[in-house]
Amino acid sequence: MKFHVLTLFPDMVMQGLMTSITGRAVQQKKIDIDAVNIRDYTQDKHGRVDDYPYGGGAGMLMQAQPVYDACQSVMEKIPQNKKKRVIYVTPQGIPFTQAKARELAAQDELLLLCGHYEGIDERVLEEVVTDYISIGDYVLTGGELAAMVIVDAVARLVPGVLGNEQSALTESFHGELLEHPQYSRPDVWHGKKVPEVLLSGNQKHIDAWKKEQSILRTKERRPDLYARYVRLQECRQLLMKQKLLHIDMIELINRGRAQLLYFGQGQILLKDMEYEIYFHACVDPSRLPDIRTWTLPVEKIPLAVLHQEEMIPY
């Protein structure tokens, strides 16, 4: 997988990403990271890439021309058959989540555009950007730190990047639950003991403890995630009433890959966050609606809704 970071500060980006896991992944050729200096594409003889905004206002604005040319220089090198996205990191974007990281990890190449000053001319954003993503409701000096966060989170999901492939499946934010508390040697530290169950060697009891602690921690620290988890479990209980018919959706929930899009009127709609496939279950056949009339938290369904009886093109 290739990451192209379009920035005014390429050294900052490369210094941050060429260490630890992402740095090793580049050395092992699991991923490729390219920092493109937008300033190299300006037509201004003084090397300027910014100007005053029309209509007044504080600060300077990055101009459209150097941003567009930098982006095009990268896009021209990407084969047409490669899956690619152009991401503008901005507080105005959708929140970056682990689900979004999984979605982006399915791409072949990602271009991350970093703004600076007061932002970038809106016209070039309208022309090249496919995704607007925010890492939080606060303001940074530029988009570089946000871009590095996204690269790190997505890179971890690329096969072979993590030494232990199970790490990405068990750490915080896989599924709807936070990770359970963890302990290492010594058994006792500052008078605090490691929970006895972890020393018991009984894997069944250990797994049950981990699940219980994950639920408790999520409820305490992230009530928003806990509410989503409870809702998914309610769906699972309904689906279990016709287990053979809905086994695919049940497994999706069990594996932490299910995103609940709709639950009501006897209908359940789930999204497989890894493969972007949609699963529909009608748990009350007497109330089967027209799926196209639903108001969903997605712009469109890119593949199809997988109905239990047939594939329904969307």
For each feature predicted by the language model, list its residue ranges.
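Structured adenosyl-cofactor binding patch, chiefly the S-adenosyl-L-methionine
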Residues: 120, 124-171
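Active-site beta-strand termini and strand-to-loop segments that position acidic
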Residues: 270-273
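N-terminal nucleotide/polyanion-binding subdomain common to many enzyme families
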Residues: 1-78, 204-220, 224-225
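Hydrophobic/aromatic beta-strand patches that form the interior of the parallel beta-sheet core
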Residues: 4-6, 34-36, 85-87, 110-111, ...
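Pre-active-site segment of Zn-dependent metallo-hydrolases
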Residues: 275-314
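SAM-dependent methyltransferases
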Residues: 1, 186-248
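Internal, active-site/partner-interface "lid" segment
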Residues: 145, 157-196
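S-adenosyl-L-methionine/SAH cofactor-binding core of RNA-modifying enzymes
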Residues: 63-116
